[in-house]
């Protein structure tokens, strides 16, 4: 089995987990973060990180009724028309059963299976503080070596997380330019980088994503830089210019600390996407993780 197939298998197993914890701590966030770090050396993938993927993907029991639900909706009849507004309305009314049914109907009529899933991701972004981090990582996990037959499992995963709390009122649209460098000093670095990636993502719902993100960003406050030291770690400096195994080796030491792994992966994203003037700040944040 190839590296890509192995990782996708762990993703597929993870999203059918019976997970009852906080949405912002969902194991798929941890798994996709590890996958991104593994990508720094695909020719010699880290054994430690691959073993962690398998362990985390299988730590919760499976849901067994995803296909049964889809089959039942098909059996009952899809109907002559399927409206996106029906799914949105069911989410706003916190009507879990109807929400599953409308999402299943969209799944069944969609040529590529994406329509319902993308709408659910957009709906989740209305509660960006709670669901933004998960929405990004779940979206990327689904699109990694995408198979249409498995999309319903990812859709049901986000449905289960959405309904854990009532959604806030529909957010206002804000005319905002997302400047990553102006927001980089954040105490929500994982959420910030998820927002930036979703802002620039290739999606049929990109406009809707941006509208939800702009509302969150309008309330986001950048913090005072927490480090006075302007020194940059020498190995990190080499990575910033040439790539390499810098983040892989740090991740191996932090592998039993999911929160630190997710933050580390966010700092990796900043390394590759923020202005070089922030490298000392990023370096200091990385070093603070391993102290």
Can you annotate each of these PLM segments?
Residues 1-291:
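Mature, well-folded catalytic/scaffold domains that follow N-terminal targeting or propeptide regions
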